[in-house]
């Protein structure tokens, strides 16, 4: 599920819950078009890499890993650093509380959305 919200000055993409980026209905062209013309994107990042939920197969949980999303969107954030902000982080996700993980995420050009963050449209 994704919503594109257009305002007079900015466009926001809101992807609060997605099963996977490599689903048959989602291809590279679709993903690129999804972000085309978007100023800020808020993207599902429930789990970081799956290690935070030992004993569970991340492939069986319908959420893309944050590290996979960062790899997929690496070229986009090179062009527009800070334009993708991660939301919907599970309480076990180290990007919520581990400074070195947060630094890695931000160093790759992504941000973790702040509570009550707003984007003026």
Language-model-detected regions and their locations in the chain:
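Active-site beta-strand termini and strand-to-loop segments that position acidic
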Residues: 4-8
